Amino acid sequence: MNPYGPSRVPEGEVYRPDRLNRKATLVAIVGAAILAFAFALVLWMGLKQTNLPAFGPSNVTRAVASATIAAVLIVTGFLTWLWLRDEHQSNPRWELEDVKPRPKWRTALTYLASYLSPAALVVAVLAIPLSATRLYLDGISVDQGFRTQFLTRMADDIGLSDMNYIDMPTFYPAGWFWLGGRLANLLGLPGWEAFQPWAIVSMAVAASVLVPVWQRITGSLPVATGIALVTTCIILAMNSEEPYAAIVAMGIPAMLVLASRIAKGDKFALAGGIIYLGVSATFYTLFTGAIALSAVAVCIVVAAIVQRSIKPLLWLAVLGGGSIVIALISWGPYLLASINGAERSGDSATHYLPLEGTQFPVPFLASSVVGLLCLVGLIYLVVRFHNNEVRAMWVGIAVFYAWMGMSMAITLLGNTLLGFRLDTVLVLIFATAGVLGIADFRLASVYQLYPTQITERTATHLTNLIVVLVLLGGLYYAQDLPQKNARAIDLAYTDTDGYGERADLYPAGAARYYKDINDHLLDQGFEPSETVVLTDELDFMSYYPYRGYQAFTSHYANPLGEFGNRNAFIEDLAIRSWDELADPQQFSDALNTSPWTIPEVFIFRGSIDDPDAGWKYDVAEDLYPNNPNVRFRGVYFNPESFDQMWQTKQVGPFVVVTHNE
């Protein structure tokens, strides 16, 4: 992004000394992705051979993570300083003589460090603190249980099946999970255990790919590296527990810039935009919808105000059509089922309004390093408003704030747009603008402000000062990232994993009995992927690829699964089991009236030795607009209903009921 038009570039200014051509850009993106994938995966595997203590009760892991973060940033910062020194000396502004060319070995080393530094940061912040546990951030708690269940499903089934219900296409975007399932198969890991390495590796790849992308956009390797590292730090602080969403968010600032170029007919930018929007739609639709709306707004502004032509709208149509084709890989089966008249009910994915969803974020007023960087970004966006690509960023900011406002407004209609999730995106945009603002000041603005006072020596000192301040600010912020994620890391150690163990070596919870339940079901001849189970033990479904008769909550349930109707059917069975359905045959007949594939297995909380207490199943109810928005209410089944045609077995606190057939 050159902040000037061609006629306004200061004499001798070189703002794009490292710009990649199209072929080099493609090679760099593919190369960065492959290198980051191998780099992160090998380091993750190596860390699994170490014996670091659990993160919570010991500071050893924190110290190792901080030292690694510092090493990554210092090495990258030093090589960047050398690169900027070379760039400064070769700048025709100074007319220096006998300038030595940059050594090829240092060029290669700087490229390697710059392209891999974001991946190394991901490893330092996540892989080191999680090295002694098999679980990822947040363990298996709350939303991570659903995500783990989906990855377990994708590792077991190469098709795009629903994470829970049998014989149903997925509603939740499957792209990230499907790829994670393939990595699980490659490594020979169960899906739940592959969640951690796939989250780390995929975010490392996305972070590293940002460097060549921004190098193409800005024409500067140091600026591209700075944006990638800042983006990685912010994502690791704000959204690392949801890796597929984090990956999409990383690319949003770049997509805003590309939207401006697409509107002008840049075919290379168009191809990149199609791939980004299409793939992002298979990863996380909320961010995709917001950035797609921004792209529409940018093209309309360019068509109506800048070019006064219909051409930008034609390019927009190509962008939309191409990305939709890619998106249909994931969304096609679900949309086809909906079009064919499949029943829908219980869709409440947008029924969530936390406190942060009631306020507009103003990151540039935060008293932090990132807040200061965002303030610099705000100043840059205001000062360089005449630049078309800066205007595109403003359009995106306006769209995201409007989305948040609409999300707050439509709460009156009993819904939201989950606007609070765009907080991260706004921080990324302003922080990215902050990096561009620093580069703009060093390369151009200072010479406009002080055209005669800035000598070659002064410019050198200014560059040195900026590098030192940026590096120290980055170190200060980045070394605190493991602590920012401390609660999520602690859950990865305190939750019981799929092998029935806690990584902190404390006694495991009730989930330690899941293996025994699975062994019992396998002994009975049940095939997990073909067996429908009624249970409120989400973690069991996260660790083993059984099919659920009911999803755990309506917020992640497939609308085609008719969550509300299933709840009513289950509760009716439970209530009537104490009356006319106490007879096993009548209970079986009533169960067979289910409009959906009936469960062959029930897993209850209760005791075989205390039949009068009943066997408990928790029904999940949507309480929106209240927060928390879910309530679990116990309904109890009469054990007498299972006296015949069913077998029962006590496994720890669970009663496992299996059909005789």
UniProtKB/Swiss-Prot annotation:
Gene Ontology biological process: capsule polysaccharide biosynthetic process; cell wall macromolecule biosynthetic process; cell wall organization
Keywords attached to this entry: Cell membrane, Cell wall biogenesis/degradation, Glycosyltransferase, Membrane, Transferase, Transmembrane, Transmembrane helix
Disulfide bond positions: none
Pathway in which the depicted protein is active: Cell wall biogenesis; cell wall polysaccharide biosynthesis
EC number: 2.4.2.46
Membrane topology: Multi-pass membrane protein
First-listed, main subcellular location of the protein, grouped into a coarse class: membrane
InterPro entries listed in its UniProt record: ArabinofuranosylTrfase_AftA_C (IPR020959), ArabinofuranosylTrfase_AftA_N (IPR020963)
A GO-annotated cellular component: plasma membrane
Identification of the protein by name: Galactan 5-O-arabinofuranosyltransferase
Family under the similarity heading: Belongs to the glycosyltransferase 85 family.
